[in-house]
Amino acid sequence: MTDPLVPAVLAFRDNGTPYSPLYDDIYHSAVGGLAQADYVFLKGNDLPSRWQKRRLFTVLETGFGMGINFLVTWAAWRADPDRCERLHFVSTEKHPFSREDLIAATNSSVADASIAALAEQLANAWPTLVPGTHRLEFEEGRVILTLVFGDAVQTLPTLWLRADAFYLDGFSPDRNPDLWTPAVFKSLARLAGDEATFATYTSSGDVKRSLQQAGFEYRKVDGFGWKRAMLVGRFAPRYRVRRHEPPLPLAVGERHAIVIGTGLAGCAAIERLTARGWRVTSLERHADVARDASGNPAGVFHPMMSRDDSVGSRITRAGFLYALRQWSALEHRGHRPLRGPEGLLQIAADEEEALAMAHTFASFAWPREYVVSVTRDDAERIANMRVARGGWLFPHGGWIDPASLCAAQCEAAGGLLERRFNVAAARVERLENQWIVFDENGAAVVSAPVVIFANAHEAARVAGLHYASTRSVRGQLTLLPADATNAPRLPVIGEGYALPLLDGVTLTGATYDIDDPDTRLRDGAHIENIERVAQMLPDMRDAFNVHAPSSLTGRVAFRCVTSDRLPMIGAFADEAAAIRDAGKLCGAWPLDLPRADGLYGAFAFGSRGLVWASLGAELMASQIEGEPWPIERDLAEALDPARFLLRALRQGTAS
């Protein structure tokens, strides 16, 4: 179960140095935080020279604290004309500051005007204080800060990246011994790239021994300020110390990808790849984007809450928060999707659930800006209509028009996107280092080293996968005219959903009809939608007094789902190679599986495409580029398209 996140408490020494009462230690040297960061961590890792002329450089830090090391590294990157194309800075933090305390801490320590401006950008982007991985982008996506909130002892083993430099900057070993244990250094060794370097202000004997045991060489150099010595070194193991090598970029001759399908999954992939400079050819069987399930007039977005903070809750939390940041970035760049005001209300299934979830929110200490428990009276005031029970409010949840989001993402891709409509992909074939896509007539359409299958129900068939089965779920939604009933002030979900559109129409839905191919609107489905919503919002039954079901309009679309209700996101397995080696792979883990170089998928999003799509696209782009993953590895493995193949291999049923 996830541990509650406990924010840092900011205090100051008499000399004005930021100080942690919890660890009885200072956040940086009294001589100066900026100078310490430059001397210890940049010069200690031979930066900026080591990142020059490189496409990608990754720093991993233990202990983000005030963010001084990140700010100084960012400033050095900005000042270097030979800087790397993309700088990833990944940092763990068990006790992050609130935004207000972060501002106070940096204001006390940052006198340099240029770095103060960067500190302001950091504060403006500061994430909600909830456990997990938070990816923030600066410099138009060329500087990426990935914050991992939680105990580093637990979170470091969940990261997947190739580090070029380590900043070992927790509180001193005698004040915070848990961050300097052999287990922590073993986790770092698992992520170290070739010739990765490290620097740390300490020269403790225990730290030296732990570094050596993990495969690092060290040397003692002059310390900063009043410290006599510090350690620098590199990863140079004398023998193999890990089962899997950290990730590398996909070896391609050209940065060109084909994206099949232009719904939420495909358009998000287009945006994330073109943001990295990839050229993308999109193939769509319809005449425009977002014509299948992504074509609904609006969709709600919110995380899933559970009493044990399940895998599903953790993934939807990450996806929800990442999507909000990405949509804001699109708007900042002038590509504005249509979305409603912030706020979404979820009504509990019964009073027992309402009480249980209120207790859960308190025990996890979820911040009120993320989710807040509400009584029935609170809910009625928020919704501006009668409700059956209390529940919980997502202040930043809401609704968005999926088609407008898809259009905005394609606009953001600019000239790097070539769009082809009315093309139905039928199969792919490998020729040397390229994948060729063929249409239904057997004609070759386009080739590229990378293909992303974002075509829902057709993905497994076109990709030739046998262990990625999905099912179709018919969903009919109902549009209630403005004169049919009073609309709630904001989206309300629970037993179905009621969503107030901008024109006074209320969108309700949606049915869940497994393996039902009927595309026609059905009166019975309209009745089902209204009755279900009326269990949350009793006044919705008034719609029957104004309009007969046969007079109502709506839309039918088909969700694509898996048996575990999680999407398929990531690299495809080479199923034939895996089955040939089934005996060796009976105890395999996801990283053991052979992969089909260049084939990736983003499909089976069910009813949560708005939450899954942006994060899934970022995960795939990171896998392709060899960048740090934007979520914990166990969460990515829960989404792995090869998970059902892996299950069959473990059970001895793969053939």
UniProtKB/Swiss-Prot annotation:
Reactions catalysed: 5-aminomethyl-2-thiouridine(34) in tRNA + S-adenosyl-L-methionine = 5-methylaminomethyl-2-thiouridine(34) in tRNA + S-adenosyl-L-homocysteine + H(+)
Keywords of this entry: Cytoplasm, FAD, Flavoprotein, Methyltransferase, Multifunctional enzyme, Oxidoreductase, S-adenosyl-L-methionine, Transferase, tRNA processing
EC number: 2.1.1.61, 1.5.-.-
Major localisation: cytoplasm
Needed cofactors: FAD
GO cellular component: cytoplasm
GO molecular function: flavin adenine dinucleotide binding; oxidoreductase activity, acting on the CH-NH group of donors; tRNA (5-methylaminomethyl-2-thiouridylate)(34)-methyltransferase activity
Pfam families to which the protein is assigned, alphabetical: DAO (PF01266), Methyltransf_30 (PF05430)
Annotated function: Catalyzes the last two steps in the biosynthesis of 5-methylaminomethyl-2-thiouridine (mnm(5)s(2)U) at the wobble position (U34) in tRNA. Catalyzes the FAD-dependent demodification of cmnm(5)s(2)U34 to nm(5)s(2)U34, followed by the transfer of a methyl group from S-adenosyl-L-methionine to nm(5)s(2)U34, to form mnm(5)s(2)U34.
HAMAP family linked: MnmC
Family the entry assigns: In the N-terminal section; belongs to the methyltransferase superfamily. tRNA (mnm(5)s(2)U34)-methyltransferase family.
NCBIfam families on file: MnmC_Cterm (TIGR03197), PRK01747.1-2 (NF002481), PRK01747.1-4 (NF002483), tRNA_MNMC2 (NF033855)
Name of the protein in question: tRNA 5-methylaminomethyl-2-thiouridine biosynthesis bifunctional protein MnmC
Organism: Paraburkholderia phymatum (strain DSM 17167 / CIP 108236 / LMG 21445 / STM815)
Lineage per the UniProt record: Bacteria, Pseudomonadati, Pseudomonadota, Betaproteobacteria, Burkholderiales
